[in-house]
A protein has these predicted regions:
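Short, surface-exposed "cap/lid" segments of acyl-processing enzymes
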Residues: 6-57
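Alpha/beta-hydrolase active-site loop
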Residues: 39, 62-81, 99
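Active-site nucleophile loop of the alpha/beta-hydrolase fold
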Residues: 60, 111-120, 141-143
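Gly/Ala-rich beta-loop-alpha elbow adjacent to hydrolase catalytic centers
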Residues: 88-97
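Short beta-strand/loop motif that positions the catalytic acidic residue
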Residues: 131-132, 138-140
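Conserved alpha/beta-hydrolase "acid-adjacent" motif
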Residues: 145-151
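Catalytic histidine-centered segment of alpha/beta-hydrolase-like enzymes
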Residues: 169-178
């Protein structure tokens, strides 16, 4: 397994080159493209090795305002033209995907993990309902602070939405990282 990305762009994007399908992972606020104990680098390598896909891990600096459309436009100059995007968002990255993912027609699937439910809930609900891709999966650890609002997800009017609660998992899936990695691989395969 590689111990580094193929490319690092301004400490914001870690890139593993592959085929025309792109897995775009947006970390939580303050997250780096490597993640704690290289969890994102390892995930990127595993996905690339298993499926041959291109993978970009996008850091979410604490002091930044992110625009998903702008980010997907920026990366075009660093990676070969991609035909399809599977978006994986963690925490604030999940919120970004829920609220803005529908704006990009190349995003065909979204996996949103522990996104803060009550930060601009109407915008989150509207974004999921407008999403025209194949599938949206929202995963919440039952020990995550947002889990107490989990039932409100049933108000989202979308046949493409699947919601999953993971017993024992906290916001960072500490001690359960393998379960989260398994869910991510399952999401990519389906």
């Amino acid at each position: 397994m590689k111990t580094e990305f193929d490319k690092i762009i301004k400490d914001k994007y870690g890139i593993i080159s592959g085929n025309k399908k792109l897995i775009f992972v947006k970390t939580g606020r303050g997250g780096t493209c490597y993640g704690h104990n290289n969890k994102y680098l390892n995930l990127a390598n595993e996905i690339s090795n298993l499926y041959g896909y291109s993978v970009i891990i996008s850091a979410y600096p604490t002091d930044s305002v992110c625009n998903l459309q702008e980010e997907l436009e920026k990366i075009k100059s660093y990676i070969a033209d991609y035909e399809e995007v599977y978006f994986i968002g963690i925490s604030a990255g999940a919120l970004l995907g829920a609220q803005q993912g529908y704006l990009n027609e190349k995003i065909t699937r979204m996996l949103l993990v522990n996104g803060p439910i009550m930060i601009n809930w109407p915008k989150t609900k509207r974004g999921i309902e407008k999403f025209q891709g194949e599938r949206v999966e929202m995963i919440y650890g039952m020990k995550d602070p947002s889990y107490r609002y989990y039932d409100i997800l049933s108000c989202i009017n979308s046949a493409k939405l699947v919601c999953t609660a993971i017993e024992g998992a906290d916001h960072n899936f500490i001690g359960m990282e393998d379960i989260l990695a398994s869910k991510m691989k399952e999401f990519i395969q389906v």
